[in-house]
Curated annotation (Swiss-Prot):
Active site: H81
Family: Belongs to the DMRL synthase family.
Main function: Catalyzes the formation of 6,7-dimethyl-8-ribityllumazine by condensation of 5-amino-6-(D-ribitylamino)uracil with 3,4-dihydroxy-2-butanone 4-phosphate. This is the penultimate step in the biosynthesis of riboflavin.
Residues annotated as binding 5-amino-6-(D-ribitylamino)uracil: F15, A49, V50, E51, A73, V74, I75, F106
GO molecular-function term, one example from the UniProt record: 6,7-dimethyl-8-ribityllumazine synthase activity
Keywords attached to this entry: Riboflavin biosynthesis, Transferase
Domain of life: Bacteria
GO cellular component: cytoplasm; cytosol; riboflavin synthase complex
Pathway: Cofactor biosynthesis; riboflavin biosynthesis; riboflavin from 2-hydroxy-3-oxobutyl phosphate and 5-amino-6-(D-ribitylamino)uracil: step 1/2
Name by which UniProt lists this protein: 6,7-dimethyl-8-ribityllumazine synthase
Record-linked HAMAP family: Lumazine_synth
Species, as recorded: Coxiella burnetii (strain RSA 493 / Nine Mile phase I)
Binding site for (2S)-2-hydroxy-3-oxobutyl phosphate: E78, T79, R120
Lineage, top ranks: Bacteria, Pseudomonadati, Pseudomonadota, Gammaproteobacteria, Legionellales
Length: 151
């Protein structure tokens, strides 16, 4: 399987958009470097991180995409909301991957401060989006290599 023979989707949270746009750019730039064309990628924006798993499920269920990259930035505030959001999003994404056997790449930053988020979205810690693009392509290849046929 070559990079020009598959399709993937990206689900991006609009909340903390200044961070998530940078993560998206990191994913798209790396995919381009790997030879993936724009017509192989579908990008969908959702209101917040909690909405990511539902759209990931819809995309995985469609069987049109060999991987779904989920991007978000959950930054700790003064309440417990952060804990609930992080848990729901990570669990939801994992459930989708297991139910549909489609790689769901968990590209949701969970940080204590905005500075930590920006550092990982093209700042001094690099752009994690590139790492998640690599993970998506790697998982697509592994899933194809270990393909199980129904008998």
């Amino acid at each position: 399987m070559t990079e020009s023979s598959f399709k993937l989707a990206i689900v991006v949270s609009q909340f903390n958009r200044a961070v998530t746009e940078k993560l998206l750019n990191g994913v798209l730039q790396r995919l381009t470097e790997l030879g993936v064309q724009a017509n192989q990628i579908k990008t969908v924006w959702v209101p917040g991180a909690v909405e990511i798993p539902l759209l990931a499920k819809r995309l995985a269920k469609s069987k049109h995409y060999q991987a779904v990259v989920c991007l978000g930035a959950v930054i700790r505030g003064e309440t417990d909301h952060y804990n609930y959001v992080c848990q729901q999003v990570s669990f939801g994404c994992q459930q989708v991957a297991l139910e549909y056997e489609v790689p769901i790449i968990f590209g949701v930053l969970t940080t204590t401060t905005k500075e930590q988020a920006f550092a990982r979205a093209g700042g001094e810690r690099g752009n994690k989006g590139a790492d998640w693009a690599d993970a998506a392509v790697s998982m697509i290849k592994l899933m194809k290599e270990i393909e199980i046929t129904d008998e």
